[in-house]
Amino acid sequence: MDLLNTTFLSIGLAIDAFAVSLSSGFIIKHIKFNKALKIALFFGIFQGVMPLIGWLTGLTFRDALANFDHWIAFILLAAIGGKMIYEACQDEEENKKFNPLDNYTLFALAIATSIDALAAGLGLSVLRVSILLACTLIASITFSLSFIGVFIGHKFGSIFNQKLEILGGITLIGIGTKILVEGLIIH
């Protein structure tokens, strides 16, 4: 696999993290550099490490993991998205809002959006590719798109000033559904 194809793979893998970063930016009231950096680091690191884990796992466990990876991603994203929608429909005083900066939430989102990167790593294990270059490129592109996505999402959240948390929840459920459908079609 050449550098151009690895770059396209990296962009494709980063799209889910970018979409979640947009949703996070909608929700964050007072955006600061360090908040966007935290989100981007979570997504960038997970997207960069998961292909390495997949590559190391190799063909031995590929079939076993492939049978349920899409379900894991769907359940995590649907649960988080559903929670966002539920909380957006509650009174702010009665309900602590969904916090995309919470470490546990970011961990779950990073895992859910990087399942496809794990699968990509499994695929890369059968190709002649520099896994370190691929992981570095995937992490860098995901980090960059996620960082920018937080600010873009925040800008649109400020302009519309509506319950965009619902849109964020729908986005997460949509991403989870896409991953599930793709996984079911492939298997």
Curated annotation (Swiss-Prot):
It comes from the Bacteria. GO terms for cellular component: plasma membrane. Keywords: Cell inner membrane, Cell membrane, Ion transport, Manganese, Membrane, Transmembrane, Transmembrane helix, Transport. The chain crosses the membrane at residues 8-28, 39-59, 65-85, 106-126, 131-151, 166-186. PANTHER family: MANGANESE EFFLUX PUMP MNTP-RELATED (PTHR35529:SF1). Probably functions as a manganese efflux pump. This is Putative manganese efflux pump MntP. The lineage of its organism: Bacteria, Bacillati, Cyanobacteriota, Cyanophyceae, Oscillatoriophycideae.
